[in-house]
């Protein structure tokens, strides 16, 4: 078979997989109505099918998107609801295993001697993708989601140090916080994190400057993980630091946000996906709202999957005056600027007429650099005001230690010994730290400073 015959065969196989995927989707109540009257023969006429938007999923929650009875699903999840009512998402064991196999195949660091500290929220499907990938590798999985009070940040640092953790998986900001916390504890991160070989980052944009910062601080490879609760896994980073879309799992389109037509090669558009392996909650032309750019050239790693840059949410694009910037643009420039100041800690405010960067430095009174600030604004393409603050003003490290201790629910408290003497169910369940007067004074002063800063900014914006 020559090259052209192979291409025809592969195309025919892809068309067949797509037809089967759409047929599975039609088993759900939503797609039975949504696709009524539409015929799909292959990829060439995929664009004729109607798009699926997030509001469709919300309106169909909880059972309308299911293509199988609920009891045949392996896991149930919900979105956080930060942008509206939570959306139900269901996944099956077979598709979870397909996604885990992709991660296991593309990441050589996931071997039988791996110990992975999973800091993704445990209600997120990606946590179970990692669990299954580690099962395939015969490796160890530590489920310690960052939103769980029983494994706060300081305990996560302790896990890495005591257990010889070789991999962590988290939102991109977490490695920055864990590294900073280790320094605050008087530890040497180069020794504390010496066992870590790979850091998986997902759930938010990962601009190049942030990747470089994590790789420098942890002396480990950073692997980007791209996906969502609705779509689950969509992309995995390669050894060259490029994100490859999972073309074995999904049929992808990149659409213009205004016209919903395909963008030109190399142009930014909204990622739109059709499930190829999902059996429980298949999606057809799901408009994710993620702004991406597909690289026109192949990656030198040899992996055939399309290479993508994830730029952030289309709804989060910042427009001030005639300027326009994505979250990836803003974060890349901010991390580059902060790195030159010897810090990783900053917070960006989006104000009506300007961006406002609050950056934490050792000597705030003597580091102002108008030339660097002007370059920062030029790199982003928007006006930027920089405010330099002292240690603990942007990140209060002590707050990372102040979470409650969690106990098993109980309605009995034995007061005869030295154990905790509780008198309510909530006291038995949660033990909040007791503050001395110095801590109380510290917290009060911080609240006053933040209130004054907030009031000043609000007044300035009202004058505009």
Please describe what each predicted stretch is.
Residues 1-105, 162, 354-358, 364-464:
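Nucleotide 5′-phosphate-binding alpha/beta core
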Residues 144, 225-227, 255, 387-391:
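Conserved beta-strand termini and adjacent loop/short-helix elements that scaffold enzyme active sites
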Residues 140, 221, 251, 383-385:
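Conserved beta-strand segments of alpha/beta enzyme cores
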Residues 197, 206, 210-298:
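Conserved AMP-binding/adenylate-forming
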Residues 168, 272-382, 407:
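AMP-binding/adenylate-forming catalytic core of the ANL superfamily
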Residues 55-195, 205-213, 217, 241, ...:
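Active-site phosphate/ATP/adenylate-binding loop shared across adenylate-forming ligases
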Residues 161-171, 217-221, 242-251, 404-415:
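A polyampholytic, Gly/Pro-enriched intrinsically disordered region
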